[in-house]
């Protein structure tokens, strides 16, 4: 019987299955950070258990770390406790830890691929919803809760039920100024935040194949905002080339063995999907979110929706609530929305290609005087690469702050946050109420669109700044 990519990875990791569909899956890779792991390690300690396979877990501090001068340590007491606790837990249980001052430190979903820890055909879990990012490598990757983190540490397995197969085909070529961030925002706008519920999404089509590894990571990263359990893209030569020579990638004959398996990781012709939709790349435009859900998208040349045009009373009330929280009036042009801050970074758009995209727009230009703008590289290695290319100088010359790596203003768990009423053009993944700080207002955009907004002081069309 023809199988999907998801079917193949699932079957290869099945330890046991009950009659009701409950299954036990082997977990190849476990990523850990400081926020969702303390109780898990404490549970092991209280039960007198060890980490079953310490070499299959990699830990890093990313959520709470400061992005300003780290020589002063962590000012917030609670954040310091979480980071210190992760370090001591990793020492006690023999887990590799990339500390705050390790140049390899960064956002968990960026450092995994950088180190070659992320590999095709593996099951990867992390106590973090954006674990789907690693699906860009043809891995089955998804977020888990703290009790599940403990279960994986103790057993290297996880109890799951198989999801449905959902394929999204995107064919064609993207117009100038349109990026993979716009593609995933368009998809979420189309299917809604519940559109992928109970499914694993495989992204396919000529556009997906043409994307770089990092662009694919952006798409898989936001799969969770479309309600799905995980997002997958079949691995190809771009993925193999990316992983070759990485510190934790297979070496010598192990590389040859791995390649043999990796090359088999594709959906068979004739495999059945429970749901399938098609998009045309040429129809996608630069996107922004206007409201308080990732499905609240409009094109940059569009208008904020008007609740009066909505027949459904619940949807009408929801629109009114979002408009009220966001401080927007119905029918406002997207380009008339004034912003206060710009944030370029996160596990969605904090990689080197994202920084290049923004720097290209900002070169020889200045940000608007009223805008506070920051770039937070996704890892120490991204920061180092950007500095070698002189991107930091472009950002600083245009008036941006050049920061240390971490999650930063994506979720405002460190000092980087919006004040009540402040409006931000952000390259992150969530625009919920209070996500970037209590009362903060978030508009999700691509790195190029964030740069354009910084220059004009309003949400703006990146195509104006491109040849």
From Swiss-Prot:
Its EC number is 4.2.1.33. Binds 1 [4Fe-4S] cluster per subunit. It catalyses: (2R,3S)-3-isopropylmalate = (2S)-2-isopropylmalate. Its cofactor is [4Fe-4S] cluster. The keyword Transferase does not apply. It comes from the Bacteria. Belongs to the aconitase/IPM isomerase family. LeuC type 1 subfamily. This is 3-isopropylmalate dehydratase large subunit. It comes from Pelagibacter ubique (strain HTCC1062). The gene is leuC.
């Amino acid at each position: 019987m023809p199988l999907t990519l998801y079917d193949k990875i699932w079957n290869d990791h099945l330890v046991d299955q009950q009659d009701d569909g409950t299954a036990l899956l082997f977990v190849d890779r476990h990523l850990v950070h400081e926020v969702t792991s303390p109780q898990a390690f404490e549970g092991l300690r209280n039960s007198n258990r060890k980490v079953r396979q310490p070499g299959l877990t990699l830990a890093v501090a990313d959520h709470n770390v400061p992005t300003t001068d780290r020589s002063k340590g962590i000012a917030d007491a609670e954040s310091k406790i979480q980071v210190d606790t992760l370090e001591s837990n990793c020492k006690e249980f023999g887990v590799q830890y990339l500390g705050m001052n390790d140049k390899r430190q960064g956002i968990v979903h960026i450092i995994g691929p950088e180190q070659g820890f992320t590999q095709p055909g593996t099951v990867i879990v992390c106590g973090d919803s954006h674990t789907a990012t690693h699906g860009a490598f043809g891995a089955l990757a998804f977020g888990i809760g703290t009790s599940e983190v403990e279960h994986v540490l103790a057993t290297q397995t996880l109890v799951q039920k198989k999801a449905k197969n959902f394929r999204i085909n995107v064919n064609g070529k993207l117009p100038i100024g349109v990026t993979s961030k716009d593609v995933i925002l368009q998809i979420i706008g189309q299917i809604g935040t519940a559109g992928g519920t109970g499914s694993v999404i495989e992204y396919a089509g000529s556009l997906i194949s043409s994307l770089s590894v990092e662009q694919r990571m952006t798409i898989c990263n936001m799969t969770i905002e479309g309600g799905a359990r995980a997002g997958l893209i079949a691995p190809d030569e771009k993925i193999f080339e990316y992983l070759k020579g990485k510190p934790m990638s297979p070496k010598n004959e192990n590389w040859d063995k791995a390649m043999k398996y990796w090359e088999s990781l594709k959906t068979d012709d004739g495999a059945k999907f429970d749901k399938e939709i098609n998009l045309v790349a040429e129809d996608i435009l630069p996107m922004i979110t206007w409201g308080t859900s990732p499905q609240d998208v409009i094109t940059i040349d569009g208008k904020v929706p008007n609740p009066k045009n909505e027949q459904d009373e619940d949807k009408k009330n929801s629109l009114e609530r979002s408009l009220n929280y966001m401080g927007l009036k119905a029918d406002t042009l997207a380009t008339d929305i004034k912003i206060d801050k710009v944030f370029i970074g996160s596990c969605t758009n904090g990689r080197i290609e994202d920084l290049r995209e923004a720097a290209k727009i900002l070169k020889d230009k200045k940000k608007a005087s009223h805008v506070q703008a920051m770039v937070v590289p996704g890892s120490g290695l991204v920061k180092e690469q950007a500095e070698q290319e002189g991107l930091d100088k472009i950002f600083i010359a245009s008036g941006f702050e050049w920061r240390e790596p971490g999650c930063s203003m994506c979720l405002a768990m460190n000092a980087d946050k919006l004040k009540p009423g402040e409006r931000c053009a952000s390259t992150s993944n969530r625009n919920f109420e209070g996500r970037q700080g209590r009362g903060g207002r978030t508009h999700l955009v691509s790195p190029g669109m964030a740069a354009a907004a910084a220059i004009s002081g309003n949400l703006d069309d990146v195509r104006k700044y491109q040849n």
